[in-house]
């Protein structure tokens, strides 16, 4: 079993070497050095988290909260660094999703969809 763990550590290192990860890391450092961008991003992420928690608890999000979230999104999207960061997060998320599909492929043989007819 240690072989699977060794491969996971190799994958971790390979992911850290991707341009997508390096770009995201650099953008985080730039935002941390920019007090305005950092505060804007923190406020936006807090609002996102609050709304997600409400949804998970089955609480309906008000029209006012939805508008506030949309306004916050538009505001942070206009900030060049934050916009680049969000794009970089999305690109890395695609890679991680693809890797997860590959890693869990063997489980599809057990739990997945029936084989497709050709």
Swiss-Prot record:
UniProt cross-references to InterPro entries, sorted A to Z: Com_YlbF, YheA/YmcA-like_dom_sf
Superkingdom of origin: Bacteria
Protein family: Belongs to the UPF0342 family.
Protein name as it appears in the record: UPF0342 protein ABC1519
Annotated organism of origin: Shouchella clausii (strain KSM-K16) (Alkalihalobacillus clausii)
